[in-house]
Curated annotation (Swiss-Prot):
<dbReference type="GO" id="GO:0009245">
    <property type="term" value="P:lipid A biosynthetic process"/>
</dbReference>
<dbReference type="GO" id="GO:0005737">
    <property type="term" value="C:cytoplasm"/>
</dbReference>
<comment type="function">
    <text>Involved in unsaturated fatty acids biosynthesis. Catalyzes the dehydration of short chain beta-hydroxyacyl-ACPs and long chain saturated and unsaturated beta-hydroxyacyl-ACPs.</text>
</comment>
<keyword id="KW-0443">Lipid metabolism</keyword>
<feature type="active site">
    <location>
        <position position="49"/>
    </location>
</feature>
<dbReference type="GO" id="GO:0006633">
    <property type="term" value="P:fatty acid biosynthetic process"/>
</dbReference>
<comment type="similarity">
    <text>Belongs to the thioester dehydratase family. FabZ subfamily.</text>
</comment>
<keyword id="KW-0456">Lyase</keyword>
<dbReference type="InterPro" id="IPR029069">
    <property type="entry name" value="HotDog_dom_sf"/>
</dbReference>
<protein>
    <recommendedName>
        <fullName>3-hydroxyacyl-[acyl-carrier-protein] dehydratase FabZ</fullName>
        <ecNumber>4.2.1.59</ecNumber>
    </recommendedName>
</protein>
<dbReference type="InterPro" id="IPR013114">
    <property type="entry name" value="FabA_FabZ"/>
</dbReference>
<keyword id="KW-0444">Lipid biosynthesis</keyword>
<dbReference type="GO" id="GO:0019171">
    <property type="term" value="F:(3R)-hydroxyacyl-[acyl-carrier-protein] dehydratase activity"/>
</dbReference>
<keyword id="KW-0963">Cytoplasm</keyword>
<keyword id="KW-0441">Lipid A biosynthesis</keyword>
<dbReference type="Pfam" id="PF07977">
    <property type="entry name" value="FabA"/>
</dbReference>
<dbReference type="InterPro" id="IPR010084">
    <property type="entry name" value="FabZ"/>
</dbReference>
Amino acid sequence: MSLSIEQIMEIIPHRYPMLLVDRVEEIEPGKRAVGYKNVTFNEQIFQGHYPGKPIMPGVLMIEALAQLGGVAILSLDKYKGKKPILGAVKNAKFRRMVVPGDVLKLEIEIVKVKGPAGIGKGIATVNGEKAVEAEITFMIV
């Protein structure tokens, strides 16, 4: 199952300029998802990060993974209409710069859910090359 940007916006509350998932290619609700962020020079962040050498901030790559995790978990009927809140980031490793023109492939696996909290393991790649990986803790409110 894949999701368009319109379907993504029905699931998570994020909107421009903070919506960082453009398309979901695969989803197993409550378990895992694969999606994409198309990185373009038109994004506001590149006006200052950095002029003349635009680089996507690592925290936004983590946020994109967290949003994809939100899509995966909020796709379950029992969480419809809720909001995913970032609780913690562990073992984040940044391996490659991401620049305008790159397509960031996002993959998240929900490894634990207990009550309103859970943990996802995410990885983002560009052309098969690892850009970032992290363990993300979230709350559902």
